[in-house]
UniProtKB/Swiss-Prot annotation:
The gene is adsl-1. It comes from Caenorhabditis elegans. Substrate binds at R14, Y15, K81, H82, D83, T107, S108, Q237, R299, R325, S330, R334. Belongs to the lyase 1 family. Adenylosuccinate lyase subfamily. It is an enzyme of class 4 (lyase). The active site is at H155 (proton donor/acceptor), S285 (proton donor/acceptor). This is Adenylosuccinate lyase. It comes from the Eukaryota.
Length: 478
């Protein structure tokens, strides 16, 4: 059956079809990891002295690790209703010498949980590299526009001047904090290890004739072979699903940060100040050919919503895990965590494309500043007046009255700074303020130095470990 004739997740077929995550999270990779875990377990058991595990058996497992008889596996699972045992039988069929020691001492969660954790770790490593590139692209945009003066907005209303670059590093800070959360999770992530059917390690204690030190060594050795630095010291049958919730929450922070950034871009595109990349043959509307819609930012907001809402499901999976283990978690985890990882990848890929082509509509930005500078210069006037001993509250009251009257005039005519400062109250500072208005950068405070400092002192050092400096630009298929 052709792929177009059956339903497939849009994450893997539309938004992430060229991503390595599609392979990392695939059934084949999962099954390969299960077999690799069986190999590591056998190697470690042999190294610690189990006579029934032979080198011939291990070599046979290694040589057949990547050979899959999928029709047989599906047939076995249909009959047994147990995926791990179906794969166990299939691997044993390929490896008759090893069949008797495959899965020795283990429970299903040895392969299921540990393989999931390896796949999650590898996915996170890729996502962190992508994330670092996204933040780096936004930093470049911010530095490029660090001196481009624009109207600040609080409550979506005109506020004191900022620069486009300073606004860019505010966005970068939100993304960087989410990046740090995910990076910290990655560094602390724990492997399940070998714990047995209910977490007591009794089966392994039996195999090693009651020698607890060898059971501890086996747990450490398998963890090391899987290239994890940390492991759970205690588990039930499964590792704590709180770790899954922490992963999902870290990615939900990415979703929230990205939605804030992309909502801002959409608003600023509506104001005519920014324009997300619009490709040569791109069509904005089937009915209105003149439109340039911020569809990439809109897509990011939609993907972000999925990440923002995901922790609720992860928390219920954690809460419903009964005693040493129930299957309340199984179906949910199979769907939730791969979807969250792929959604994060789709979001970051689209964000990277936006930041690589985001442009400032400088003429319109300049016009908006010129229209508002007559009002925005009054804050500077208030500070100057207080320097001369004027009561700050008195200055505020006079400026408020003057500005509101001028705002009414602005509806029908252009207002300049001399009109808003016509009151004799401003005589001592008027010329100084008017002189500054000719160069609006004078009203942006430390925007330029803040932008440079944040990128140099915080942003760059944080992402450097994961940043691929040779990464090319992203081209979106849709």
């Amino acid at each position: 059956m052709a792929s177009e004739d059956k339903f497939e997740s849009v994450l893997s077929t539309r938004y992430c079809k060229n991503s390595p995550l599609v392979s990392i999270l695939s059934e084949t990779n999962k099954a390969t990891l299960w077999r690799q875990l069986w190999i590591w377990l056998a190697e470690a058991e042999k190294e610690l002295g189990l006579k029934q595990v032979t080198q011939d058996a291990i070599d046979e497992m290694k040589s057949n690790r990547d050979v899959f008889d999928w029709p047989f596996i599906r047939s076995e699972e249909r009959k047994l209703k147990h995926d791990v045992m179906a794969h166990n039988h299939a691997f044993g069929k390929l490896c008759p010498t090893a069949a008797g020691i495959i899965h020795l001492g283990a429970t299903s969660c040895f392969v299921q949980d540990n393989a999931d954790l390896i796949a999650y770790r590898d996915s996170i490593d890729h996502i962190l590299k992508r994330f670092a590139t996204v933040i780096d692209r936004l930093a470049a945009f911010s530095l490029k526009n660090k001196e481009v003066v624009t109207v600040g907005r609080t409550h979506y209303q005109t506020a004191s001047l900022v620069t486009v670059g300073k606004r860019g590093v505010l966005w970068a800070q939100e993304l960087l904090m989410a990046f740090q959360s995910l990076s910290e999770f990655r560094d602390k992530m724990r492997f399940r290890g070998i714990k047995g059917a209910t977490g007591t390690q009794d089966s392994f204690l039996t195999l090693f004739a009651g020698d607890e030190s060898k059971v501890e060594a086996l747990d450490e050795l398998v963890t090391k072979k899987a290239n994890f630095s940390n492991r759970f010291l205690i588990t039930g049958q499964t590792y704590s699903r709180q770790q899954d919730s922490q992963l999902v929450f870290s990615l939900s922070l990415l979703g929230a940060a990205a939605k804030k950034v992309c909502t801002d871009i959409r608003v600023l595109q509506a104001f005519g100040e920014l324009l997300e990349p619009f490709e040569k043959d791109q069509i904005g509307s089937s009915a209105m050919p003149y439109k340039k819609n911020p569809m990439k930012s809109e897509r990011c907001c939609a993907l972000s919503r999925k990440l923002i809402n995901a922790p609720q499901e992860a928390l219920t999976i954690l809460a419903d895990q009964g005693l040493e283990r129930t299957l309340d978690d199984s179906a949910g985890r199979r769907m939730l965590i791969p979807d969250v990882l792929l959604t994060a990848e789709a979001l970051l890929t689209t964000l990277q494309n936006i930041f690589e082509g985001l442009s400032v509509q400088t003429d319109n930005v300049k016009k908006i500043v010129e229209d508002e500078i007559a009002f925005l210069g009054l804050e500077k006037a208030m500070m100057m007046l207080t320097e001369e001993g004027v009561d700050r509250q008195q200055a505020h009251a006079v400026i408020r009255k003057t500005a509101l009257e001028a705002k009414q005039l602005q509806a029908t005519q252009k207002v300049d700074i001399r009109q808003t400062m016509a009151d004799p109250f401003f005589d001592s500072v008027r010329d100084r303020v008017v002189g500054l208005v000719n160069n609006p950068i004078n009203f942006t405070g430390r925007c330029v130095s803040q932008t440079e400092s944040f990128i140099a002192k915080e942003l760059k050092p944080t992402i450097d470990k994961y940043l691929d400096k040779s990464a090319g630009n992203v081209q979106l298929d849709v």
